[in-house]
């Protein structure tokens, strides 16, 4: 009250009488509380994905970051010493999807080093082991032993191992380092012991202690913080990332699976780079490790409604994006097949299907049991969208009726896209739609009846992105209480609202494109917000039925009743 004497004037204790009518029970969805992960705010590379080396693939490009010329293939790399040079080459790469690699021309043995400081430094823990790997070959000379050091910011070596780079063809080398002390901002140092010209790529450093101990896994403390929410599902990879900035930037799930060196990196529309080391297979594994349903989201044949990028296509026709265009119709059959192939990758027989075999080759012969798939995200419901969405929806429904398709109704709780999106869902019989809205706490207080009047015969609702926003965008007690209050109304409408997920989820200090977020972090700390504990309260104490009740207050204030 001292902080806000106007709004909280004349507050007094309130006595409430609650009468429960057990005969008016509604089932609450078992999937009500989940999480939505998008690579925004460095949520993946430099965040949840445990890789410690930045730009390990030498694929950074100025177009990742608004044509920033410093954001290039050598970003995050430096040469220590004057007797070596670093350049970038593209002849005979490891894989066409990974065309750039480093050429480290060493003219003085043992005196020069190739350095990488990771994402704002490399955090290390004393006694813990780290997996190092690189692909290398010798372009000139014989090559030889290469020292690999972990170096603290004062220059002290706090971990060392060695590999041999002598092959004339690409060959992967692996080693393990043990940190001899803690470090907050260490660097990786690669020191050739022989004068030669080396080609290097996919230089990686991974903690062995990842979430559930998985190789190519997730940062243990961040992943555990998410798991502690007890999410019933995970929506991924976006959001705007899913349908991208222009057609060429649509998230191609096939480019995110398979050997890491063969994955296709992608510009992140939030202004940085996606290695896609955290790809679809890893998302499925994360869901499995938490006991959560996977909810992948694929573009509905159109890019993000805010796209500013133009793209060339198969007929060299310049097509400007946004919702002014979509995937050319002559390419839609292949795109639809890609959607169907994803379902086969998740659920297909490991011996009898092409993509089921690929899943097994990745180490997971058992199906992931995919039950939901999102098509579209906050799209403008234009004729271009409708035509393509219908094609995809009909194909999935015909081939996989067991999979629930989740449609979209735009980015707001009202307006043209919301109304037309709902009309389209009703016309096609879409079983669930994805609603998004970011609103003031007052809206949540005064719209607790929002879903009371929804037609129960129509599509179920997935409230896929929501949050209470105040001026300055804090995540505080006021926003958390408003969200908690609104979730009680959502539970009351558990026969309509099937799923909910707060957004955004993660934000790294110094690399934030959006506020508020549920969890803030740096390389050594994870800081859940007040809103996190609202989500955790509902996730860890999920109800199965809503019992109708009435509340009587001793002061009769309706304004207070809305907040109880």
Residue ranges of each PLM-predicted region?
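Active-site groove signature of glycoside hydrolases
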Residues: 191-193, 207, 237-240, 297-305, ...
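Hydrophobic faces of well-ordered beta-strands that scaffold small-molecule active sites
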Residues: 31-37, 232-236, 294-298, 371-375, ...
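Conserved, mostly hydrophobic/aromatic
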Residues: 35, 58, 134, 230, ...
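An active-site-proximal structural segment forming one wall of the substrate-binding cleft
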Residues: 177-189, 195, 210-231, 275-290, ...
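Extracellular and organelle-lumenal recognition/adhesion modules and their flexible linkers in secreted
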Residues: 1-276, 293-295, 310-322, 328-333, ...
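Active-site beta-loop-alpha junctions enriched in small/polar residues
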Residues: 38-40, 236-241, 299-301, 375-380, ...
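Catalytic-core region of carbohydrate-active enzymes that cleave or remodel glycosidic bonds
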Residues: 285-286, 390-404, 422-541
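Carbohydrate-binding surface patches
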Residues: 562-564
């Amino acid at each position: 009250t001292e902080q806000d004497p106007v709004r909280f004037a004349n507050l007094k204790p309130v006595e409430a009488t609650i009468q429960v009518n057990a005969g008016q029970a509604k089932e609450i969805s078992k999937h009500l509380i989940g999480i939505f992960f998008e690579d925004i705010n460095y949520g993946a590379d430099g965040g949840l994905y445990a890789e410690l080396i930045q730009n390990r693939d030498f694929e950074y490009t100025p177009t990742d970051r608004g044509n920033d010329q410093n954001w290039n293939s050598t970003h995050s790399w430096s040469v220590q010493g004057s007797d070596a040079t670093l350049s970038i080459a593209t002849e005979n790469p490891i894989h066409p999807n990974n065309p750039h690699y480093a050429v480290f021309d060493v003219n003085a043995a043992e005196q020069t080093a190739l350095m990488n400081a990771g994402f704002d430094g490399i955090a290390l823990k004393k006694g813990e082991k780290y997996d190092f790997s690189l692909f290398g070959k010798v372009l000139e000379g014989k090559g030889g032993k290469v020292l690999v050091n972990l170096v603290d910011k004062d220059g002290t070596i706090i971990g060392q191992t060695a590999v041999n780079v002598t092959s004339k063809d690409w060959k992967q080398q692996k080693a393990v380092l043990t940190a001899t002390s803690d470090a907050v901002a260490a660097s990786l140092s690669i020191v050739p012991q022989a004068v030669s010209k080396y080609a290097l790529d996919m230089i990686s450093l991974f903690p062995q202690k990842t979430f559930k101990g998985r190789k190519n896994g997730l940062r243990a403390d961040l992943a555990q913080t998410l798991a502690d929410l007890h999410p019933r599902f995970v929506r991924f990879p976006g959001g705007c990332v899913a349908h991208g900035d222009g057609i060429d930037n649509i998230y191609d799930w096939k480019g995110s699976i398979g050997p890491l060196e063969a994955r296709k990196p992608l510009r992140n529309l939030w202004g940085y780079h996606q290695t896609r080391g955290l790809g679809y297979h890893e998302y499925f594994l994360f869901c499995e490790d938490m006991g959560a349903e996977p909810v992948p989201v694929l573009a509905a044949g159109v890019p993000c409604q805010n796209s500013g990028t133009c793209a060339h296509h198969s007929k060299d026709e310049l097509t400007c994006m946004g919702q002014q265009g979509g995937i050319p119709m002559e390419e839609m059959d292949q795109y639809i097949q890609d959607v169907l192939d994803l379902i086969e990758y998740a659920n297909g027989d490991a011996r009898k299907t092409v993509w089921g075999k690929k899943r097994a080759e990745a180490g997971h012969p058992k199906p992931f049991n995919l039950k939901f798939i999102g098509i579209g995200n906050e799209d403008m419901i234009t004729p271009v969208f409708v035509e393509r969405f219908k094609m995809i929806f009909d194909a999935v429904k015909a081939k996989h009726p067991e999979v629930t398709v989740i449609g979209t109704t735009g980015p707001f709780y009202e307006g043209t896209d919301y109304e037309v999106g709902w009309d389209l869902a009703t016309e096609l019989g879409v079983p669930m739609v994805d609603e998004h809205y970011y609103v003031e706490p007052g809206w949540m207080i005064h719209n607790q009846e929002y879903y009371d009047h929804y037609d129960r015969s129509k599509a179920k609702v997935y409230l896929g992105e929501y949050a209470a926003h105040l001026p300055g965008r804090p995540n505080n007690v006021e926003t958390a209480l408003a969200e908690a209050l609104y979730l009680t109304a959502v539970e009351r409408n558990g026969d309509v609202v099937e799923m909910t997920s707060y957004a955004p989820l993660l934000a790294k200090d110094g690399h934030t494109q959006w506020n508020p977020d549920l969890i803030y972090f740096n390389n050594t700390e994870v800081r859940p917000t007040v809103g996190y504990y609202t989500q955790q309260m509902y996730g860890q104490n999920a109800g199965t039925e809503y019992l109708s009740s009435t509340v009587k207050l001793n002061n009769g204030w309706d304004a207070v009743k809305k907040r109880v």
